[in-house]
C-alpha cells in the first residue's frame, strides 16, 4: 500500500460468481475515470488472473474471528464493514464488482465526507407506497455498491458491540444500514442521477448520459423470482454496457 496516495479503493471477490475479469475491468474503469492517484485493493480468496497493479488482501483474514463465526445468511457482505476499522489516512471507497463506471468520478472521490456516503435507491424510493412497509422490514432503499468515507470508525464499533443481536435481526448489510442507521441520519447519500440501475430504472437497460456508473446486481431479483428481465455485466453482449466493460481490458 502506497501511503503517499490518499485515495484508496477496495473491492471484494470471493467464491466463483465473478471471475478475475470483473476485478481487472473495475480497476481499468477507475484508472480511466479518476485523475487522482489511488491505490486499488482486492480482498479475495483467489487471486488467480488478477492484474499485477491490483493490491491483494486475503479474504479469509479480513475482520475479527468472531465475525466469521456467523454464516452468510447473517448480514450478508458484512465483511465490507471491516474496512471502517482500517488504519489508513485519507479517503476510502469500496466498489462492488458488478458496478460499471462509465463517467468521470474525480470530483466525487475528491469531496470531503463528514458521513459515510452510500447510494440511495432513487429508482425505487419514489414509487407509490415506497415507504409503506418500513416497519415490516421488507423494503430496502440503501445500496452499498459504491461507498466513500474518511472516518467512520463508529460504524464498525457499533456493529461489533451489538453483533449478536444485529446478526439475529438482519439478513443483509443493506437492510442493516437502512433500518438501523438511515433513520438516525448517520449516513449520507450520493445525489440522484449519479448512479443508475440497469435492471430496475425505468425504462430499464437504458444508457443515461448524466450517470457516472450503472449497477447490475441481480441476485435478489432472481432469488425472489420478481419476473424482471435482469442481466449481469457478463450477460450484456449485444447491449450498450458490453463494449464499455470489455474496453477496460486495455
What are these regions (language model features)?
Residues 79, 96, 142-144, 172:
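A conserved catalytic-core signature of glycosyltransferases
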Residues 1-25, 36, 42, 50-59, ...:
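A glycosyltransferase accessory/donor-loop signature
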Residues 55, 70-76, 130-137, 204-210:
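Short, surface-exposed amphipathic charged segments that create phosphate/polyanion-binding patches used
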Residues 56, 76-127:
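GT-A fold catalytic core of metal-dependent nucleotide-sugar glycosyltransferases
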Residues 117-143:
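Short beta-strand-to-loop element that shapes/binds the nucleotide-sugar donor at the catalytic cleft/hinge
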Residues 43-88:
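Active-site-proximal specificity loops/subdomain of glycosyltransferases
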Residues 19-22, 64-72, 125-132, 232:
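Short, charged, surface-exposed secondary-structure boundary motifs
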Amino acid at each position: 500500500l502506497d501511503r503517499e496516495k490518499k485515495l484508496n479503493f477496495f473491492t471484494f471477490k470471493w467464491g466463483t460468481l465473478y471471475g478475475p475479469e470483473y476485478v481487472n475491468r473495475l480497476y481499468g474503469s477507475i484508472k480511466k475515470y479518476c485523475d487522482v492517484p489511488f491505490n486499488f485493493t482486492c480482498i479475495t480468496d483467489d487471486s488467480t488472473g488478477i492484474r499485477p497493479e491490483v493490491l491483494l488482501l486475503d479474504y479469509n483474514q479480513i475482520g475479527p474471528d468472531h465475525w466469521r463465526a456467523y454464516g452468510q445468511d447473517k448480514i450478508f457482505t458484512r465483511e465490507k464493514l471491516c474496512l471502517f476499522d482500517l488504519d489508513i489516512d485519507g479517503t476510502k471507497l469500496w466498489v462492488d464488482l458488478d458496478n460499471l463506471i462509465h463517467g468521470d468520478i474525480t470530483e466525487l472521490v475528491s469531496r470531503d465526507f463528514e458521513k459515510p456516503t452510500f447510494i440511495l435507491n432513487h429508482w425505487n424510493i419514489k414509487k407509490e407506497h415506497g415507504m409503506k412497509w418500513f416497519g415490516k422490514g421488507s423494503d430496502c432503499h440503501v445500496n452499498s455498491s459504491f461507498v466513500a468515507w474518511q472516518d467512520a470508525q463508529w460504524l464498525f464499533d457499533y456493529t461489533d458491540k451489538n453483533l449478536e443481536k444485529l446478526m439475529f435481526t438482519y439478513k443483509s448489510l443493506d437492510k442493516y444500514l437502512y433500518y438501523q442507521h438511515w433513520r438516525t441520519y448517520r449516513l449520507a447519500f450520493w445525489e440522484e442521477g449519479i448512479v443508475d440501475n440497469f435492471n430496475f430504472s425505468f425504462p430499464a437497460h437504458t444508457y443515461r448520459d448524466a450517470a457516472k456508473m450503472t449497477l447490475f446486481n441481480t441476485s435478489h431479483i432472481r432469488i425472489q423470482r420478481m419476473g424482471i428481465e435482469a442481466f449481469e455485466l457478463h450477460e450484456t453482449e449485444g447491449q450498450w454496457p458490453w463494449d464499455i466493460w470489455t474496453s477496460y481490458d486495455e
